[in-house]
């Protein structure tokens, strides 16, 4: 029926993207979501025969949630690295004095480890579950993958906020080695 979802592959010369609006990020770098109008035409052979629900459940759900979580972990790890550099530089400027951000740095390192462990647990769950196509389509597996995504996305916001607190204005500026 016309409401069924299908998965289709398009080659570069078979589609066009027309930008419809520009996203105003209000200072939030990395959140660009410009709007586009997608137009495409291709032979029917490029439509996957398998129902989209099966494709999504058996590969797309886990792959996208785990990939997003891993990317977010990388973003958070970079922010923590910059915060570490900031604290290290502060310690060098004032030997013998614990920099104010040192305690927050310990806290944020623990949070980063939590995200990493979450992603690894999700990867292991997927590796085990993908052996059984029925299990991949189960509600339990979908909840597990959603939990990986939600947990990762929520914790990295806290990590970024901690890194910004550690680096202060130098973390907000775009042209410093501590830019978050």
Describe the residue ranges of each PLM region:
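Glycine-rich beta->alpha junctions and the first turn(s) of the following alpha-helix
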Residues: 25-113
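Hydrophobic/aromatic-lined pockets within catalytic cores
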Residues: 84, 88, 127, 164, ...
